[in-house]
Each structure stands twice: as C-alpha cells, then as structure tokens.
C-alpha cells in the first residue's frame, strides 16, 4: 500500500528551507534537539488561539532566535508588548543560560496556509460542525485566495461512525512528485467525544523556478 512522503521534508534543500537553522557537534546535538522540541510545543500550546503556522529556530553561541509565523500577531505581542515579554520569560525557564530573541512574522493569507487550514477544520470538528461542510468551506476559501490546488483528508470516527475511515476532498491540482512545486502541508488533530480525528491538508501554490542568470551581464563581467 502506497504511503505519502512529507512534502516539506522531500523539498528541503531544493525549494524549502530548514525550520531549525543551527549546527551542533555530537556532544550537544541531542540536547539542542530536545530543547527545540520543548520550545515548539510550548509556543504552540501557549499561543494556539493566535494561529501559529510554523516556528523557525536559529541558534548562535549563547543566543536563540525564534521566528514565529502567526495569523494574529497582536494576540502574541499583547498590549504594549506585554504578551511577548511574558512568553520570553516563560521560555527562559525551558532554555537555561541562553538569551532568547522573539521575532513575530505575520501570515498574510491564513486561508492559504496548510497548517492554519488544518487547525481551523479541527476546531470546527470539535464544535460538532459536519466534517464535509468544514472541509468544503475551507477548500472554497483557499481557492478564492488564489492557490492552484488543495486537498484535505479527515481520518477517524467521522460523524460518530462505529468504524473509522478516511475521507478526501480536493480541488485543483496537487503535483506531489514535482520537486519544484511549492506544496504546503499541515496536520492537526480534533479531540471529539468519539475520539481523535486527524486532519491533513496539502496546498499547491505554484511552481518555484530557479532564478535565470543574465548571460549579457556575465559576459560584461568577464570582459
């Protein structure tokens, strides 16, 4: 039975970048990795209502910089920057002897962001909204925002059924095997009275073509 590779992992180094931008030797690698995991989990849990799409972590000697991509930056920053200071102080307890810098980046089109779409569908399922309706509405909003294609999948005891199943809905094209295709992927879980329901979303935003070198400029430089 065919399984799908993670679209982001497949394209790292081709058209996608790492979410963790640091290097460590064997001695410190495991500690840094666990620290990253704790930071991501804490920020996600603490700022779930703000719609956190992804978190980039950059490390220097005694400094950690977090780039938090969110649909509602005001909710994280808070009044007069109080929210961001509170978050920094809480993170400082997780990360020992390191200075934390937090940079908030606004997600301009949350209706076209795969992670935020998945979380939105999951939230609707928890509010007992029909899964088909939640999926179709999200697809319509995404297509209106200008994406080339979108595919959604819900897995679990849908509508309280005795036997778990998976249902897919898609519109447009999703070229999963094309490496230059900019495909965004998101996953979320809905905690319902019947158990967990997994939500997966793939969004195709178009092709990323390599920058063409200007031959004339190159010739002038050599002359």
From Swiss-Prot:
SUPFAM superfamilies on file: Prokaryotic type KH domain (KH-domain type II), Ribosomal protein S3 C-terminal domain
The family database entries (SMART domains) matched by this protein are listed as: KH
Q: Which residues form the KH type-2 domain?
A: 39-108
Disulfide-linked positions: none
Q: Name one GO molecular function term.
A: rRNA binding
Could you tell me the Gene Ontology terms of the biological process aspect for this record? Answer: translation
Q: Which domain of life is it from?
A: Bacteria
Q: Which UniProt keywords apply?
A: Ribonucleoprotein, Ribosomal protein, RNA-binding, rRNA-binding
- What GO CC terms are in its UniProt record? cytosolic small ribosomal subunit
InterPro entries attached to this UniProt entry: KH_dom, KH_dom-like_a/b, KH_dom_type_2, KH_sf_prok-type, Ribosomal_S3_C_sf, Ribosomal_uS3_bac-typ, Ribosomal_uS3_C, Ribosomal_uS3_CS
**NCBIfam families, alphabetized:** rpsC_bact
Q: Which PANTHER family match?
A: 30S/40S RIBOSOMAL PROTEIN S3 (PTHR11760), SMALL RIBOSOMAL SUBUNIT PROTEIN US3C (PTHR11760:SF19)
Q: Subunit composition?
A: Part of the 30S ribosomal subunit. Forms a tight complex with proteins S10 and S14.
Similarity section: Belongs to the universal ribosomal protein uS3 family.
Stated role: Binds the lower part of the 30S subunit head. Binds mRNA in the 70S ribosome, positioning it for translation.
Q: What is this protein called?
A: Small ribosomal subunit protein uS3
